[in-house]
Amino acid sequence: MDPEVSLLLLCPLGGLSQEQVAVELSPAHDRRPLPGGDKAITAIWETRQQAQPWIFDAPKFRLHSATLVSSSPEPQLLLHLGLTSYRDFLGTNWSSSASWLRQQGAADWGDKQAYLADPLGVGAALVTADDFLVFLRRSQQVAEAPGLVDVPGGHPEPQALCSGGIPRHKDLPGLLVVRELFSSVLQEICDEVNLPLHTLSQPLLLGIACNETSAGRASAEFYVQCSLTSEEVRSYYLSGGPEAHESTGIIFVETQRVQRLQETEMWAQLCPSAKGAILLYNRHPPLQSGVGKSHLSHPSAPALSLQL
C-alpha cells in the first residue's frame, strides 16, 4: 500500500446507494479539546490568515467512525459524524504537532484521531460514456496538493442544510446529512468539470480512504457514471465553470489501464485523495465490467491525454 494513503472502509462489491447509508450525528463524535486547550489552533489560524487573508473558516462534518451493518436485508453503512471546521483542520491535521496529537489521542482516548479535526471529504471516480476516468491537474494556487493530479471532489457542507447561523447537531437530521453527502460529490463534479447535472448518474459509495499526509483525514470515495464521452467532457471543461480556477488541465485515463496505474509514472503525480479513489475503484470489479452502467461506446481518444 502507498504510504500516503490507507483504506478505512471497503463497501460491498458494486458500492452502496444513498438509501443504503445512514448517519448518526452527535457531539460525542466531535474532536476532543487539545491537551492544555485550543490556543494553539487559534495561533495557527491567525498566522495563516495573515499570510493568506483570503481564506475563511467554514463548518465541516467530522468522521468519527463507520460501521457496516450486516444484519439488515441489504448491506447498510452507518457513519458516525460530528461537526468541525476548516480552522480546526489547519490547527490539528495540518499542524507541525499532528504526529504528536495522534500519539496523545491513542494514549489518552484509545483513538489516535481523537484530537484531530478530520473533516470528511468526498471524491469521485468519474467514468465517461466511452470508458475513461476523469482527473484534474490542480492549480498552483490551491492550498492543498498544488500542481498534483486529483479526482473531482471537495466537502459536504453542513451550512448547506442551514438557512443561516452556525450549524448545530440537533438541527441536522441524519437523512438530510446523507443527502448532502451524496449530492455534494455531484455538485463538486458540476463545479469543477463544468458538467450538467443531468449527465451524471446517482453516486455509489465505494468506501472511505484516509490521507496520511494530513494525519489520516478521511474522504468518502464514490463511483459516478457520466453519459458524455471524454471529448464532450473535455469541451464542457474547457468552456469554464464555477471552480475553473482550481485546476489547470483535464486528464483522461482508459478504465482498463487504471488497474495498473500504480506501475506508471502518473501515480507519483496523484495527490493522496486521488490515490485513495483509485485504490477503492480497483476493488470493485463489477463496476469496471459494465454492470449497472449505461451503454458504452468504444474509446476513440488516446489512453492518456492531457489538456493544459
UniProtKB/Swiss-Prot annotation:
EC number: 3.6.1.45
Motif (Nudix box): 174-195
UniProt-annotated binding residues for substrate: F56, Y86, R138, A143, D150, H155, E157, S273
GO CC terms: nucleoplasm
Keyword line: Hydrolase, Magnesium, Metal-binding
Reactions performed catalytically: UDP-sugar + H2O = UMP + alpha-D-aldose 1-phosphate
Nudix hydrolase domain segment(s): 117-284
Binding-site positions, Mg(2+): E188, E192
Its biological purpose: Hydrolyzes UDP-glucose to glucose 1-phosphate and UMP and UDP-galactose to galactose 1-phosphate and UMP. Preferred substrate is UDP-glucose.
Family: Belongs to the Nudix hydrolase family.
Full protein name: Uridine diphosphate glucose pyrophosphatase NUDT22
Gene designation per UniProt: Nudt22
